Amino acid sequence: MGIQKESLISKGQVSKCIRKLDYENYEEFKNACIQYLDLISKRKKFLNPHQSFETNVLHFTKDFIQNIQYMINHINLKSIQKLVQDIKQANKVYLYAHGDVRSVCYNIQRELQIYDIQTIICDADFNKDYHFLDNDILIVLSTNGHSFHYNKRVIKRIKESHVDQWLITCNESITLCQKQIIVPLLDEKYSEYIIKYMIDILLLELQN
């Protein structure tokens, strides 16, 4: 571990810090850092520095609305209703996500708590042993599947989990869970925004 030389602290202190961040070891922490840097490098830019802020906002809004309309016209709304039905009937709802879409888990958890639905957000690397019971469901959110590229162990653990599973993703080539909702995209650049909007629709359906 070369990091202790650069940071001028002991190997034991580095390991302790890493464990406090919920990582099992340095290798896992390093892979997470590589993944994060990769996500940053792929981050989309929407604002044109040569245009005014007002023009940028208008262009973004116009394109965003077009992408929303495309998604609504092509998504399987019955699948969303089925997932909502499963959520309402679930004993516990487990949520797992990586990257930007992980923040959505907290929105879902907050909304489900309103309906007294127990919700657990799984750790970022799916390391903990979750004791899934009958009527529990696991919802996996992945905008484009890039996160899974770095961690095959997570894929293996999810597939081996004995629990009813749902995957919500914009990438139709991922076959991870028994049940899937594919979020159609007009422009891949808007994937993070469109998948979050789709979750908002799902949460609206919970009110029925």
Regions found by a protein language model. Give the residues of each.
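HTH-adjacent hinge/linker in prokaryotic transcriptional regulators
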Residues: 1, 5-79
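Glycine-rich phosphate-binding loops that contact phosphosugars or nucleotide phosphates
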Residues: 88-207
